[in-house]
Amino acid sequence: MLQLNQVIHPDTRNKRFKFEPFLLKEYNFGLDPDRPVCQFYNPSNPNNSCPNGSLCPHKHVSSMYSNKIVCKHWLRGLCKKNDHCEFLHEYNLRKMPECLFYSKNGFCTQTPECLYLHVDPQSKIPPCSSYEKGFCPDGPKCANRHIRKIMCPLWLTGFCPKGAECDYTHPRFEAIIDRLRIKPDEDAVEEKEKVANGSDKEDQNMADATSNGNTEEKDESGP
């Protein structure tokens, strides 16, 4: 009986077609999607970071995919885009897609083994802008969310270095925001001129009223 080893040459699997480098360079064809990430690749400098370039056997993760969520098709083994997928091909529990069953029903039958993200339905309700300003007339019947926060003492003094990342609330006092806004020199000069003109008119009106009062007193006293 003819054996298979006698028919197939042992070096056959090492043979490469001429078009394979093109497929490897353009489409990453034949590469394992679960291969490790290249430690030399720098997304900010992709052309001069990895010495192997596009022929590197490891994965080059672009910076545009660093903040994406995990690919739901990759979780099921059905994604065909490989490295060209817009979503992450890695198990990152913080960037998992949302569990549709939990979002619709409020519970999940796979808990706690579910790999998808369970988002609290209350967190999807937009915050109440009136409550953030200090008072909401609708009270507990308000359709929006009332978030109780402590005012930032640094923000109340004028400036908070943490900005939007601060754990405390930064209230916006819209009534005085225009007065606190830093204005260009031209606007400041115009505003000063308006104030000066207004004060001059008031002084002139006061002077006219005083002079009219004096003339009336003289007329009443008579000669």
UniProtKB/Swiss-Prot annotation:
Cellular component GO terms held in the UniProt record? cytosol; mRNA cleavage and polyadenylation specificity factor complex
Q: Which InterPro entries match?
A: CPSF4/Yth1 (IPR045348), Znf_CCCH (IPR000571), Znf_CCCH_sf (IPR036855)
Q: Where are the zinc fingers (C3H1-type)?
A: 32-63, 65-92, 93-121, 122-149, 151-173
Give residue spans, biased composition: Basic and acidic residues: 184-204
What keywords tag this UniProt record? Answer: Metal-binding, mRNA processing, Nucleus, Repeat, RNA-binding, Zinc, Zinc-finger
Q: Does the record carry rRNA processing as a key word? A: no
List the molecular function annotations (GO) for this entry: RNA binding; zinc ion binding
The domain of life is Eukaryota
Note one Pfam family from the annotation: zf-CCCH_2
The record's subcellular locations are: Nucleus
Question: Which biological processes are named by the entry's GO terms?
Answer: mRNA processing
Keyword flag Iron-sulfur: no
**Protein's name in the database:** mRNA 3'-end-processing protein YTH1
Q: Give the species this sequence originates from.
A: Debaryomyces hansenii (strain ATCC 36239 / CBS 767 / BCRC 21394 / JCM 1990 / NBRC 0083 / IGC 2968)
